Amino acid sequence: QVFGALAKMAVRIAKEYHLSLSYVDMGGGYFGGRDDMPDYRDYFKEIGKELSAHFDPQKTILIAEPGVSLISRATTFETTVIDVKDIRGRKFVVTDGSRTNLNPLVTRHLYPHHMEYLSDPSVRNTEPSQWVCGATCMEYDKLFEINEGPALVPGDKVIYDTAGGY
């Protein structure tokens, strides 16, 4: 709805100032990569509907930067458990990846992922809580907590889905 409103504003400005534009640049910031959120097709359907009310698609080019909404689903990031530390009764699972590898600006708080276990997880002890962390030793490098899951061991894989966008 936001990008539709921006496109509608571009139409309003073009009409108000009698502009004949060769292009309209809608910029970036398009979310994507999750089934519960819109993807680039949803955004551009709405943008196109609003812009076509005034602009001729043969004469006015739509410029957009859909980056993340296109690439985030296309890439996974595989990490390996390199150590498990028990510190004051808490389990910290250290991986060879980091939060900075997944999101350099460290703005994400949700990291969709799945596990590949080195051996059958059904025969492992169940841990009440395990924090999966990066190898930076920085406090912000805690990625997520696993509650009541099979104990992770060195060699297990944590594979992050939709990791292509930052």
Q: Which residue stretches match the model-derived regions?
A:
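Active-site loop/helix belt of alpha/beta enzymes
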Residues: 1-83, 149
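Charged (often Lys/Glu-rich) extended helix/loop segments that serve as interaction or gating elements
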Residues: 46, 57, 61-166
